[in-house]
UniProtKB/Swiss-Prot annotation:
Pfam families: ThiG (PF05690). Its EC number is 2.8.1.10. GO terms for biological process: thiamine diphosphate biosynthetic process. This is Thiazole synthase. It comes from Ruegeria pomeroyi (strain ATCC 700808 / DSM 15171 / DSS-3). CDD domains: ThiG. Catalyzes the rearrangement of 1-deoxy-D-xylulose 5-phosphate (DXP) to produce the thiazole phosphate moiety of thiamine. Sulfur is provided by the thiocarboxylate moiety of the carrier protein ThiS. In vitro, sulfur can be provided by H(2)S. The keyword RNA-binding does not apply.
């Protein structure tokens, strides 16, 4: 796995901390998933106080604060600075939403905010689209990680555009890439790892499942399977059949 700003992730799964039925289920799901990174919202921390923060710390995972809910560059930058003070980390998942219904990122504002935050000493994890040019601009702005969406946030649709995600992996072979948003099933997570992505970030698929803890276990196993499959160098798909049984020595009857 590629390093994220010099840090090796203990696990390719990044898991969000919102929407769980209870703090106890959140904790159980995290432990079942083996997730190495927890994404947290400054708004959640402000509302729940030290109890929530203490529980997350006790999980022993890396913390990735986010700027969820921000719609302007100024708002995102301000939220990032506040998060750094609260959580004590230069990591920031930069979310800058441009469309209310689809929650599609505002890529123009995203690039500007990424540049400002990088200059301010942040290590930026930008939630972006699968557009190659946007990816190039984000790297030029100082980002060392890209987080393209699989599908709109919370949609559970999986990987809407595998072609674009494969192209991004090929275009940025040395850059850590994370599929962020849209994962709904373990098979979606496995597929992202099969494509060579370094990690997946998900929240709703686990938190809103009928049994979040069981879904967390399923995600952990799927991610492991996808990672192993990618390492194994799988065969390429073909349009025509290819016999797996040799015909040498086969008897011919007249």
């Amino acid at each position: 796995m590629r390093a994220f700003y010099g840090t090796e992730l203990p696990n390719p799964l990044m898991l969000g901390t919102a929407q769980y039925p209870s703090p106890a289920i959140l904790e159980q799901a995290f432990r079942a998933s083996g997730a190495g990174v927890a994404t947290v919202s400054l708004r959640r921390e402000s509302g729940a106080g030290q109890t929530f923060w203490s529980m997350i710390r006790d999980l022993g995972v890396l913390i990735l604060p986010n700027t969820a809910g921000c719609h302007t560059v100024k708002e995102a930058v301000t939220t990032a600075h506040m998060a750094r003070e609260v959580f004590g980390t230069p990591w920031i998942k930069l979310e800058l939403i441009g469309h209310t219904d689809s929650l599609q990122p505002d890529v123009f504002g995203l690039i500007e905010a990424a540049r400002i935050l990088t200059e301010d000493g942040f290590q930026v994890f930008p939630y972006t689209t699968d557009d190659l040019i946007v990816g190039e601009r984000l790297l030029a702005a100082g980002c060392e990680v890209l987080m393209p969406w699989g599908a709109p946030i919370g949609s559970g649709r999986g990987l809407n555009n595998e072609y674009a995600l494969r192209a991004m992996r090929a275009e940025f072979p040395d850059t850590p890439l994370v599929v962020d948003a849209g994962i709904g099933l373990p098979s979606h997570a496995a597929r992202a790892l099969e494509l060579g992505y370094d990690a997946v970030l998900l929240n709703t698929a686990v938190a809103r499942a009928g049994d979040p803890v069981e879904m967390a276990r399923a995600m952990a196993l799927a991610i492991q399977a996808g990672q192993l499959a990618h390492r194994a160098d799988p065969i390429e798909a073909r349009d025509m059949a290819s016999a797996s049984t040799p015909v040498i020595g086969k008897a011919f009857l007249s």
